[in-house]
């Protein structure tokens, strides 16, 4: 019994309600239950038909006027104590989710939990949520790794049905898995070196030494490096495309799309430069080509094929859109508020550069993100106070979702490393064939039958099997061995 059950004892003249919860029987007066009419037991007293009663309880005895509930009797003692005292207490040894489901069944809100148990209950609930999230993340990571490994095996199986399947499989494994063998590592290192060389050449080409009044000056060395890099990128993409087991899945891979986009500007520029006629359309096309040349920076994304960290970052952002959206929302609200505040106190100052709300947007953005270029800044005391508040709020707002995103990044990074380790095997995974089933008695009978047949073939036949003793069997075996030896000698 719970202590609260002794506070109230129904009188003889009061109408009682008989409750049976998992074998625990208790008689409670109606006035006690009607104190909380929105709970399950409170609604039970307002039912006017047996059908309505059975919707709220598991069974009902008309003769005994007893309501039966197939629930945990030990938990119901705390529910019953709630009706007597108006306060809900939490068991020490109880699972938080089980208790939460139980009070939800009885229609009791968590707000009725007493202050002595509320903080402990919320702490346990948060801990359980964190453990549950970690477990789900691990399960998803494990399931995803298993699915990707299974997909890798299925891709290998497709090569058996393709033309030049074995050759294409060897090429595909070496192009997709740098840790497969020494040649695959050399290909990966070469590809990484070409990507870096292309980025360096693009950056060097933008220096003042390679510029004039008309624009960029074509340097033979840099142009040769650019052509060599594009030739490598084109050949690499073509080899991947030819060796891929499925052309459709090949173009669904974001890394392959990046490879394709990285070579488009070069060929688009080459196509425009071959046009000799001059027209307005060609001039406009030239401007487009200049923009496309800037797209060469996307080649740096090719490093994701060789970087576990970049792939993990992409997976983290893809699965953290809710947290990223929340971060952008917080920043947008803060920028809007502080830009208006700083504009209202700085607009009349001649020495201030914060003369419009769009300029204040820029100032609030670099302030909340704690960048602080210093190109625009407040000059009044009120403006400096607002700026200090803006910076502090920016630190707090940015720090809240970053922790969640960082935890997800750590999990995806570890998952990606585990997958790379699994794919480092020297040989591709093979099918696990089932073991053949056989009966040992059948095998023994077949061996004996073969032995008897061989005896018959050399003229040793047992006339009466029942009269055969151990010595005769030994004689037959000696004769069989002698005959076999003679046959081998003759051969």
UniProtKB/Swiss-Prot annotation:
GO terms for biological process: action potential; potassium ion transmembrane transport; protein homooligomerization. The chain crosses the membrane at residues 183-204, 221-243, 255-275, 286-306, 322-343, 385-413. Its main location: membrane. It is found in: Cell membrane. One of its GO terms (cellular component) is membrane. Residues 1-182, 244-254, 307-321, 414-491 are cytoplasmic. GO terms for molecular function: potassium channel regulator activity; voltage-gated potassium channel activity. Residues 358-369, 370-377 dip into the membrane without crossing it. Signal peptide: none annotated. Expressed in myocytes. Detected in lung, spleen, brain and heart. SUPFAM superfamilies: POZ domain (SSF54695), Voltage-gated potassium channels (SSF81324). Pfam families: BTB_2 (PF02214), Ion_trans (PF00520). Belongs to the potassium channel family. S (TC 1.A.1.2) subfamily. Kv9.3/KCNS3 sub-subfamily. Potassium channel regulatory subunit that modulates the delayed rectifier potassium channel activity of KCNB1 by namely slowing down the deactivation and inactivation time constants. While it does not form functional channel on its own, it can form functional heterotetrameric channels with KCNB1. The transmembrane segment S4 functions as a voltage-sensor and is characterized by a series of positively charged amino acids at every third position. Channel opening and closing is effected by a conformation change that affects the position and orientation of the voltage-sensor paddle formed by S3 and S4 within the membrane. A transmembrane electric field that is positive inside would push the positively charged S4 segment outwards, thereby opening the pore, while a field that is negative inside would pull the S4 segment inwards and close the pore. This is Delayed-rectifier potassium channel regulatory subunit KCNS3. It comes from Rattus norvegicus. The gene is Kcns3.
């Amino acid at each position: 019994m719970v202590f609260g059950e002794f506070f109230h004892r129904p009188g003889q003249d009061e109408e009682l309600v008989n409750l049976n919860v998992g074998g625990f029987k208790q008689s409670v007066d109606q006035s006690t239950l009607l104190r909380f009419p929105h709970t399950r037991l409170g609604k039970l007293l307002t039912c006017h038909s047996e059908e309505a009663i059975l919707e709220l309880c598991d069974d009902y005895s008309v003769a005994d006027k007893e309501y039966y509930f197939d629930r945990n009797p030990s938990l119901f003692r705390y529910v019953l104590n709630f009706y007597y005292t108006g306060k809900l207490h939490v068991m020490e040894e109880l699972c938080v989710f089980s208790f939460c489901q139980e009070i939800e069944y009885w229609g009791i809100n968590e707000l009725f939990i007493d202050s002595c148990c509320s903080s402990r209950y919320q702490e346990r609930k948060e801990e359980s949520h964190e453990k549950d999230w970690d477990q789900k993340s691990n399960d998803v990571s494990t399931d995803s790794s298993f699915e990707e490994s299974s997909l890798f095996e299925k891709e290998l199986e497709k090569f058996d049905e393709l033309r030049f399947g074995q050759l294409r499989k060897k090429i595909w494994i070496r192009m997709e898995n740098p840790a497969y063998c020494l040649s695959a590592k050399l290909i990966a290192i070469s590809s990484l070196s070409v990507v870096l060389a292309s980025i360096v050449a693009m950056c060097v080409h933008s220096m003042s030494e390679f510029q004039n009044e008309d624009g960029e000056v074509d340097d033979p060395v840099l142009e040769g490096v650019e052509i060599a890099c594009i030739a490598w990128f084109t050949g690499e993409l073509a080899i991947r495309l030819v060796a891929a087991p499925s052309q459709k899945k090949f173009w669904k891979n974001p890394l392959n799309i990046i490879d394709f986009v990285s070579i488009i500007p070069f060929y688009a520029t080459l196509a425009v430069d071959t046009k000799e006629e001059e027209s307005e359309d060609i001039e406009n096309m030239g401007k487009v080509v200049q923009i496309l040349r800037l797209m060469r920076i996307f080649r740096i994304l090719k490093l994701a094929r060789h970087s576990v960290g970049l792939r993990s970052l992409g997976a983290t952002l893809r699965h953290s859109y809710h947290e990223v959206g929340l971060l952008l929302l917080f920043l947008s609200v803060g920028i809007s508020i502080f830009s208006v505040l700083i504009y209202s106190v700085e607009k009349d100052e001649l020495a201030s550069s914060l003369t419009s709300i769009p300029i204040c947007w820029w100032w609030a953005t670099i302030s909340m993100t704690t960048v602080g270029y210093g190109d625009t800044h407040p000059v009044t005391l009120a403006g400096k106070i607002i700026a200090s508040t803006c910076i502090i709020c920016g630190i707090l707002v940015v720090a809240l979702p970053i922790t969640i995103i960082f935890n997800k990044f750590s999990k995806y990074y570890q998952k990606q490393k585990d997958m790379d380790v699994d794919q480092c095997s020297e040989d591709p995974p093979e099918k696990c064939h089932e073991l053949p089933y056989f009966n040992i008695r059948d095998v023994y009978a077949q061996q004996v039958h073969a032995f008897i047949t061989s005896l018959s073939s050399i003229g040793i036949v047992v006339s009466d099997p029942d009269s055969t003793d151990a010595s005769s069997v030994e004689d037959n075996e000696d004769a069989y061995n002698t005959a076999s030896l003679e046959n081998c000698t003759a051969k």
